[in-house]
A protein has these predicted regions:
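A short core secondary-structure module
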Residues: 308, 312-363
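A short, Trp-centered hydrophobic/proline-enriched beta-strand micro-motif
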Residues: 278-286
Length: 552
């Protein structure tokens, strides 16, 4: 048995590591081509990228696929080293490479109508394709998928179908929140969604008692002091129950990281214990009606007045704005709009909590609810700030014009957490697909036995595993203190698309019933759609990844 395991380990290491090396060579050829074109254009990156978006963003997608395959291969090797690479995990590994190599060669879907393949680049020829494709038998993939799904049906009592490779402590955390979902969330999520009301306060109180809001806050400030990988596991499981519940922690994660990174000691001592205990519920006020991805163009002003600041302007897409009692406001402290992001500051502004019949009791804050398709439970608002008086001590770090750089430090964690939420949403869609397809019978057999059904389910399984490992890789890098903007961006880019694909395919498996509001999958489809829009749209995310790759 030991020899067999060693042979398996060596086979994985040699076969797929060699393929990844070949993909890395292709990546370098494309990168050199793009760098040369950029240099010849004499444009800065932004101008050049806007003229060549399809190829530049396509490069980001190809790089993301290569990184995802690298991480799933590392996962397989690690499991083999621990004698835990079972048939199911081996099938995930094999199908992942077959399917993603096929897409790299024939077209990666950047969206439903946009595809990129390596031969779209001048530097890649048919010989490059052949060196990669000759390693695979694409004709037997359906048989592999059928076997994968048959094993999955018998594994449906396991929280994650595959062995994630994480240490026991993380899987214990996962189990704790899976039980929380089963008792409190799963049977209520569709009701909360259809009623379009706030998630009950009791859920927030229960999450606070579990330490969710202080998950990564140091113990000295009342938190649990856990790492970003633990945050991923918690976010993933909570979002698997309901994305609204999974996103409650995101509000506190952004706020606490801002304060931890750049707050004064007084601000840390005052706010962090309250956030940890769930006493303070923050809302991030960054986006404006005419400033979404381009935060440098915001116009909300913070004007000094007798030792205080008066903030005026409009904000939009403010999640949980009414129930929150702390607004994290990004405003312009330097009136020169040409300074763009260099003239912005962040303010920690306490406010009174709203109620269902009075959203904003503060006289200087007014707002209207934005009705949304999905991602409900916290409510979205457009806010009007009219000479909102703010004490000087509310200025983050008491540093003016540093807001954008302060905010940038949180982007890695925010995108990692969003990727984890996307994995949770995708896993929920998969859970429902397996259950429905196993129980739904047509033509005297369960529909899961039809090729086009089990092929869909198999793709969900392998893509969730790919997205999960890419997300964990980004989180581990963050925990080690490494710069991980690329890894976080790749995870967010890929996992958002995976969530939408899984939700869409799961609904298709449900057929007409999936279109009925009473079925959970109709909600999950609505929830999944937002993941490629917020925390950096898919287009902006691809731009950022490409810029990082070409600039390094």
């Amino acid at each position: 048995m030991l020899n067999k395991t060693n042979n398996t380990k060596n086979s994985i290491s040699n076969k797929y590591s060699k393929i990844i090396k070949g993909l890395e060579n292709i990546f370098e050829k494309i990168k050199k081509e793009l760098v040369k074109k950029k240099e010849l254009s004499q444009d800065n990156f932004k101008v050049w990228e806007e003229k060549n978006q399809h190829l530049v963003h396509g490069f980001a997608w190809i790089a993301t696929y290569i990184e995802a395959l690298r991480q799933i291969n590392n996962w397989g090797i690690e499991l083999a080293n621990k004698n835990k690479l079972n048939e199911f995990e081996q099938l995930i590994l094999d199908i992942s490479f077959i399917e993603y190599i096929r897409q790299i060669l024939n077209g990666i879907p950047m969206s439903q109508t946009e595809f990129i393949k390596i031969t779209d680049f001048e530097s890649i020829n048919k010989n490059d394709e052949l060196k990669i494709s000759e390693n695979f038998n694409f004709s037997n993939v359906s048989e592999l998928k059928e076997r994968l799904v048959k094993i999955a049906i018998n594994n449906d009592n396991i929280i994650t179908l595959e062995n994630t490779g994480l240490e026991t402590e993380y899987e214990q955390i996962r189990e704790q929140f899976q039980k929380f979902n089963s008792l409190n969330v799963c049977n209520n999520a569709n009701k909360w969604h259809l009623e379009d009301k706030l998630i009950p306060q009791k859920i927030i109180d229960d999450l606070a008692s579990l330490g969710v809001f202080g998950l990564t806050i140091p113990e000295k400030y009342g938190g649990l002091g856990l790492n970003k990988l633990a945050m991923c596991v918690v976010s993933e499981e909570l979002a698997r129950g309901y994305i609204g519940v999974g996103s409650l922690a995101t509000r506190t994660e952004i706020a606490s990281e801002l304060i931890l990174n750049d707050g004064t000691e007084t601000q840390k001592d005052f706010w962090l214990p309250k956030i940890s205990q769930g006493e303070t519920i923050p809302a991030a006020c960054f986006t404006e009606p005419d400033s979404g991805s381009d935060l440098g163009s915001i116009t909300t002003k913070a004007i000094k007045d007798d030792g205080k600041f008066l903030i005026s302007g409009n904000k939009t897409w403010i999640t949980h704005a009414s129930r929150s009692n702390l607004l994290i406001i990004l405003a312009r402290t330097n009136p020169d709009i040409l300074l763009k992001h260099k003239g912005l500051s962040i303010f920690l502004v306490p406010k009174n909590q709203g109620k269902e019949d009075e959203f904003f009791p503060n006289k200087s804050i007014s707002g209207t609810e934005i009705k949304v398709l999905g991602y409900r439970g916290m409510k979205e608002f457009e806010l009007r700030l009219d000479n909102l008086e703010v004490e000087k001590i509310s200025l983050l770090g008491e540093n003016e014009n540093s807001g954008f750089s302060q905010l940038m430090k949180t982007f890695e964690s925010a995108r990692i957490q969003t990727a984890a939420r996307a994995v949770g949403v995708a896993q929920n869609a998969l859970d429902l697909a397996i259950s429905y397809a196993s129980n739904r019978k047509q033509f005297n057999k369960s529909i899961i036995n039809f090729e086009r059904v089990y092929n869909k389910i198999a793709m969900m399984i392998i893509e969730i595993a790919l997205g999960r490992q890419l997300t964990y890789f980004a989180a581990k890098n963050k925990d080690l203190g490494f710069r991980c903007d690329l890894e976080a961006g790749m995870a967010k880019l890929l996992c958002a698309r995976i969530a939408w694909s899984c939700a869409d395919n799961s609904l298709q498996i449900h057929g007409g019933n999936g279109y009925a509001l009473e079925y959970d999958i109709s909600r999950i489809l609505c929830d999944a759609r937002v993941l490629s829009i917020f925390e950096g749209s898919a287009e902006i995310q691809a731009q950022i990844v490409a810029k990082g790759l070409i600039g390094r």
